[in-house]
Amino acid sequence: MSHVISVVSGPAATVELSAAPGQVTIVGSATGLVRLTGQLHWTGHAPITASRLNRVAGVLQLSYRCAAASPCTGNYRLVVPWRTAVVLHQPAGHVVISGLAGPLRITAHSADISATGLRTPSMQVAISSGHMSATFAAAPRHLAVSLTSAQATFRLPAGTGYAISSRVTAGYLQVGIPQVAGAAHNIAVRIDSGELALLSG
């Protein structure tokens, strides 16, 4: 079975997407609307879906969850105004992100994530059993990374120094960027098991 996804909303301060396993593309654009398109596929019972806009908080929540004992997958394309804050929960699959300039928070499991052209002032990432590569077009003020059985590579603009704090239980942290104690730009790293590379350029 399948179902077409089509959600169009006015601008929201934050868009929160809880996706079913599958492919997610998120694009920051010079648009005044939030637009989610795509398709859900499933076997058994239809996925549980919800779209809710909290106008007071300015939060648009988009949720797609497989029903019990009914495997499902999704293919999503989310286009947002480029300064919109984005929160993504991705249980498995492949994620491609480009052009975002608002705060970004990602929680993912068994996912391959690629992000380019980021101008986000802050990013929080928690990945288990997956991989992420991210390239920043502007230096983030705050970056927090948590890895469990995961690998990640972040490329940050040259010429900016960072205050870096880290806790590595099992794994490896490669620091190829300038470290400056007390810098306005800071990076917090927690690696329970995995590898993280912080590189310039």
Task: Locate each region found by the language model.
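A general sequence property marking short-to-moderate contiguous segments
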Residues: M1, L60, R141-H142
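Short linear S-[DN]-x-LW-Φ motif typified by the pepsin-like aspartic protease active-site region
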Residues: M1-V56, R77-V79, A85, I97, ...
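Residues that act as N-cap/strand-start positions at coil-to-secondary-structure junctions
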Residues: S2, S9-P11, H45-I48, C72, ...
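Secondary-structure transition/turn motif
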Residues: Q39-H41, S63-P71
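Right-handed parallel beta-helix
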Residues: V87-S128
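Short, surface-exposed interaction patches in beta-rich subdomains
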Residues: T116-G201
